[in-house]
Amino acid sequence: MSDLSAKKQELIDQAENELREIAVNIVPIENKNDPSWERGAQDFLYGLMLAMLEDSLNPELGMTKEKFNFYNLAKIATYRDPDPDNPFGTIREYCGGRDKLSKVQSLVSTVINNAPNTTRSYMGVLLSRISIFQDGGICYATSFSDMLFDDFVDQPTALFIKVPDEKESRHCIATMCISQLY
């Protein structure tokens, strides 16, 4: 493996780890007695983010840095085909046909390849957590950033995050921002 290939793989591995952390922050495991619903929703979200990451590696697919954002993630996650017998056909197609080493298909299959009632339960958990990304202010705030977290802690820095206490649904945004510093 060349030095360039090794560096590329290292960056991909780092991005995958960060995407997993983001999925964990958006859909934390709160039900310790039966974490399967939250874990499935978390894996589905992580799988979609990995699909977007894979697409960003191929310029022909058009997944640019500007398009790789929470708004588009929420749009993909909530997309349903009009066919009541196959509401996830487009998502299945989007996630299928990937490289044989891709984790995407195995991560999303629990949600999209299950009985309709089971799928609805997973999606119920997910939709309650990602509904925040339908908020115009959140879409704007998360669609770009001029902060570089890679060198953020190289010198003394103060970060102020203003999140209203009464808007608990926005707390995960602050959590994700802070976790990126570590």
Please give the residue ranges for each predicted region.
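P-loop NTPase motor domains
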Residues: 1-182
